[in-house]
């Protein structure tokens, strides 16, 4: 028989290793980072044509519900591109010591409180703009540090 303290310790360690943020995408059971495809790789600091990737791409199917990774306030709209295309939308979320930009979503609102795991919005149609890409939610820390450990 396994002592209760060992079971509790194992559960706490497992939770800590999983990161403090909630699952971001309803179509995935965990926050899985996009691997490489013809458009590039989804991990933090992956090489791009003229720059490094400033965030992490979390796999998610087009049209899926996207959840708030932590409790906080949506403090405004964020747009990843200068042009108007079908996926040029997102938000800035701040709270619990975190600040992130989340791109490629149609948010339910651009300002206001939200709880961890609550519906934040819906993933926009990445396949329309980037056919064959692994559809994903882009998550970027406001200070440009690596968010991977929190996922």
Curated annotation (Swiss-Prot):
Transmembrane segments: none
Entry's localization field: Secreted
Binding site for Zn(2+): 53, 57, 138
Domain of life of the source: Eukaryota
InterPro entries: Dup_hybrid_motif, LECT2, LECT2_chordata
BP GO terms, sorted: chemotaxis; negative regulation of Wnt signaling pathway
Cellular component, GO annotation: extracellular region
Protein name as catalogued: Leukocyte cell-derived chemotaxin-2
Lineage: Eukaryota, Metazoa, Chordata, Craniata, Vertebrata
